[in-house]
Amino acid sequence: MESLVARFDALQEAILTHIESQDDTLESQIRYWENIRKENAIMHFARKQGLTKLGLQPLPTLAVTEYNAKQAIQIHLTLQSLLKSPYGSERWTLPEVSAELINTAPQNCLKKGGYDVSVWFDNDRYNAMVYTNWDYLYYQDVNEIWHKVKGEVDYDGLYFTDHTGERAYFTLFSTDAHRFSRTGLWTVHFKTQVISSSVVSSTNTPSFDFEEQQLPGPSTPTYTELTQASPCGRGKSRESQPTSTTSPETSGLRVRRGRRQRKSGPGPGETPSKRRRGGGRGGGETRLESAPSPGEVGIRHRTVERQGLSRLGQLQAEARDPPMILLKGTANSLKCWRYRKQNSSNCGFLFMSTVWNWVGDVSENHSRMLIAFKSPGQRDSFVKHNLFPKLCTYTYGSLNSL
């Protein structure tokens, strides 16, 4: 036990000597973290043996010593990898390779030259948040190759442009805007620059109305028209009166997908031109279904009911599949873009999927995301009024149901 205490004291002495020396080479920082690694390994071993002290040094709990030891191992290996890169010969101080800085956003990146970015919510300097950005960020890609990039700022948040040319956001101002802002607007101040909402207003999605397909019960699915645009196509809707028998894209037209209208006469209190089901959830007016035109293919988002439809009627109903857009790009750019669209006041789509990828796809832009629409017209309007992420591609498609 005395030898263990002696080794522990020697390591602590070496650590203190390094701190006082203020050496700024990466080799010296690697030696420092090697000593930290050994120190935590000894403390963890002593704690497992039931000891609470090593000499006069109290020992933390077993969980703490295990965490500190693993963290020291990770940083030690990271610095050894950095030493083999072109940036290993740069000046590196002890604070720049500290665990606290590495765990600061963006995590697992080395950082140099921090500066403040002040965000004034509602353009009020007394209602502000201060964020930290960095002149330079060092990170490893999936192939363990080191890259040096600049920390950048725009109206949305703090980011860096990775080696593929994509923006990787590590701080989004909208997160705090939901808590502190009344208007949802803010002004960004950093160094000698100011970014306000008026500067980026030209890139905002213009407001436009769109039709929505309601999701009623399975007995009487109907089309409805929005009284007001909802954030993501789930706003309050009202029934509209049938005005024609053209395609379901016509405003106010109601299309029947339930059982065929009975040939019997109207019941009490009903007119020959209108028949309402009292027991259906939707309570909508029913119309005979017509054959879909080429422009109507792709407007449905629910599975067609099997009962009460002839073979021809079922084929006609199934022809209207929900139209889709398949986005292809990097995971980070698609996630940031989806976050902005879901928090936008005018989404203009029906549903948006999470970011996913095909198993075994190792290409650079392997991530995928699906966007569903209620009609091809809504899809065309979405493409017209929205900008997709940089280097992102898209293609059209449709599904039998969602």
Swiss-Prot record:
SUPFAM superfamilies, per database record: E2 regulatory, transactivation domain, Viral DNA-binding domain
PTM statement from Swiss-Prot or TrEMBL: Phosphorylated. Sumoylation plays a regulatory role in E2 transcriptional activity.
Entry keyword annotation includes Ubl conjugation: yes
Stored InterPro entries: E2/EBNA1_C_sf, Nucleotide-bd_a/b_plait_sf, Papillomavirus_E2_C, PPV_E2_N, Reg_prot_E2, Regulatory_protein_E2_N, Regulatory_protein_E2_N_1, Regulatory_protein_E2_N_2
Bias (Basic residues) ranges: 254-263
Localization annotation: Host nucleus
Listed Gene3D superfamilies: 3.30.70.330, E2 (early) protein, N terminal domain, subdomain 1, Papillomavirus E2 early protein domain
Molecular-function GO terms, alphabetical: DNA binding; DNA-binding transcription factor activity; nucleotide binding
Biased amino acid composition, Low complexity: 240-253
Region (Transactivation domain): 1-202
Pfam families referenced in this protein's UniProt entry, alphabetically: PPV_E2_C (PF00511), PPV_E2_N (PF00508)
Glycyl lysine isopeptide (Lys-Gly) (interchain with G-Cter in SUMO) crosslink residues: K328
Entry function: Plays a role in the initiation of viral DNA replication. A dimer of E2 interacts with a dimer of E1 in order to improve specificity of E1 DNA binding activity. Once the complex recognizes and binds DNA at specific sites, the E2 dimer is removed from DNA. E2 also regulates viral transcription through binding to the E2RE response element (5'-ACCNNNNNNGGT-3') present in multiple copies in the regulatory regions of the viral genome. Activates or represses transcription depending on E2RE's position with regards to proximal promoter elements including the TATA-box.
Family designation: Belongs to the papillomaviridae E2 protein family.
Full protein name: Regulatory protein E2
Species classification: Viruses, Monodnaviria, Shotokuvirae, Cossaviricota, Papovaviricetes
Gene that produces this protein: E2
